[in-house]
Amino acid sequence: MAREYPLNLYRNFGIMAHIDAGKTTCSERILYYTGKSHNIGEVHDGAATMDWMEQEQERGITITSAATTTFWERTEDGATADTPKHRLNIIDTPGHVDFTIEVERSLAVLDGAVCVLDANAGVEPQTETVWRQADRYKVPRMVFVNKMDKIGADFFNCVRMIEDRTGARAVPVGIPIGAETELEGLVDLVTMEEWLWQGEDLGASWVKAPIRDSLKDMAEEWRGKMIEAAVEEDDDAMMEYLEGNEPDVPTLRKLLRKGTLALHFVPVLGGSAFKNKGVQPLLNAVIDYLPSPLDVVDYMGFKPGDEEEVRNIARRADDNMAFSGLAFKIMNDPFVGSLTFTRVYSGVLKKGDTMLNSTKGKKERVGRMMMMHSNNREEIDEAFAGDIIALAGLKDTTTGDTLCDAKDPVVLETMTFPDPVIEIAVEPKTKGDQEKMSQGLARLAAEDPSFRVETDIESGQTIMKGMGELHLDILVDRLKREFKVEANIGAPQVAYRETISKEVEHTYTHKKQSGGSGQFAEVKLVITPTEPGEGYSFESRIVGGAVPKEYIPGVEKGIKSVMDSGPLAGFPVIDFKVALIDGKFHDVDSSVLAFEIAARMGMREGMKKAGAKLLEPIMKVEVITPEEYTGGIIGDLTSRRGQVSGQESRGNAIAINAFVPLANMFGYINTLRSMSSGRAQFTMLFDHYDPVPQNISDEIQAKYA
């Protein structure tokens, strides 16, 4: 079977946004108009096609990014224009801050993105976070200002906020006509026409009309700004424009596309997905301005086993190259078992092929291959460069692994995942479920790299670690639904860290004599604090064989054993470096083990001398509240050891920004609801680690000692 759609007709893009901006509704409408789902699912009914896990439907939020393939032909006047059918692979990403990791994984495999904003709230904190992630992956994007039918909707305020908050240049290409209940349609600034949605056919048809007199001046002004941005992309067009000639429509689209792909600016459109207005122009804009796999620069990978990770192996969207792909998501499907969502970067993959997982160095066989449409699937026999597919039955592949042709191996990506900041103890309600719970947790951890499961050595308890309370709540919920395990959970605990505050030099001698050969090792260590975030490093400065080479790995092993359990309260130690500068050994009594013990004991003593201190995660908190509650909320944040860093008006509400220790934020949602009669909302994300005040540090040490 040959390729059905040429690569220039592909668009792999994600839909990203803050929680509640209407992202899932947008995806739904896209699937409806592109003919993939026959009735529109509403999030409020708990029936959206993209939100396919039961809990998502209950909570009305999106948790897993489902990947969907659908098709679209550019439409004008409700009739199809003379452009061929494009193939859209859409990834719906979650907007809730606890699931930032999902967004990160999706961005790594997308070519472009549509950022959905709430017309009333504008650029919210999570939007900024996702935007920064997209900047890091250099993803070209456009903005859809959604919910233009809401009270307080303000399109131009959103355009200003995009520029103020993200630093990007926002270029409106379509301006909504009217707002709130008066929303009628859109002025298309490229063709200078009105699109009006009037019928009762769920927005499937619309009419085009000349721009009414009352809107002409505004349309001309914004069209001028758009053309100025576009002609900056091409010297000839700029000269023509300065001589008074505007570019024609195809040229204008070409220049806008060029600027979007180069990340010089971001096209902006408005509408209301819920009211079915403005979705078709959004789809046209995806085709006009977002990249196809051919527009993306070569994907550079490195040779498996290369510790330097020199990225000198190119992979691009070309069927004739060797196969390479990236597994970006694992899902448990009730009918097929484990599904591995994979982006094919180069080459062709056929059913029955054997491929190499170059990240793990293991071979995998391709059993069933599927094209996914939200929650139903189509079996396929081969996949081509640019496709996003699901593979069933892979044994060793986890999120972020590269799959490739064993004859031409490459590692494409090493995904970095943040450390969890919160942990809870969990145990099954009935002892007989212990085994089932362990299996369930292991499968959930395979799906989600930001979730870790560990066993506490001293208490034997199972500990779940994650990115926030909602994150862990949902995982406990999934244990119950998918694995039928009822679990009891303990109170959430903060993931503290330990570090040191000054450099010390410390000598430790380990001597043990008990008849026969004894144990002897002496080490002299310099322990130095490093900058926050630099992590740990070890070096040996031994000269003249004071400690023989073969014992030095033992020294490092001893030091590392202290890293997992620091001297104050047994928390992991971060941001320090150790140098072994001198030592003594004995021809008979010294061994690797003796040096390991000496280094471990030396570190424990040395760290106490080096001013060991506890660190706690500090969260960046933003509370959006009606003005009358600000005084009480600020007072409450301060009482939680928070530092309020500023407040600003946002629409008809106030946004309060603060840094607050995570330890004081548990259950905050309930306090906030009762303080504001349920009208305020907050988001928080991990920002940095800070030293714990001495009195609290003493309490924590007493508790864990």
Swiss-Prot record:
Annotated GO CC locations: cytoplasm
InterPro entries according to UniProt: EF-G-like_DII, EFG_II, EFG_III, EFG_III/V, EFG_IV, EFG_V, EFG_V-like, G_TR_CS
Chief location: cytoplasm
Pfam families, A to Z: EF-G_D2, EFG_C, EFG_III, EFG_IV, GTP_EFTU
Entry's Gene Ontology molecular function annotations: GTP binding; GTPase activity; translation elongation factor activity
Protein purpose: Catalyzes the GTP-dependent ribosomal translocation step during translation elongation. During this step, the ribosome changes from the pre-translocational (PRE) to the post-translocational (POST) state as the newly formed A-site-bound peptidyl-tRNA and P-site-bound deacylated tRNA move to the P and E sites, respectively. Catalyzes the coordinated movement of the two tRNA molecules, the mRNA and conformational changes in the ribosome.
Protein name per its UniProtKB record: Elongation factor G
Organism: Ruegeria pomeroyi (strain ATCC 700808 / DSM 15171 / DSS-3) (Silicibacter pomeroyi)
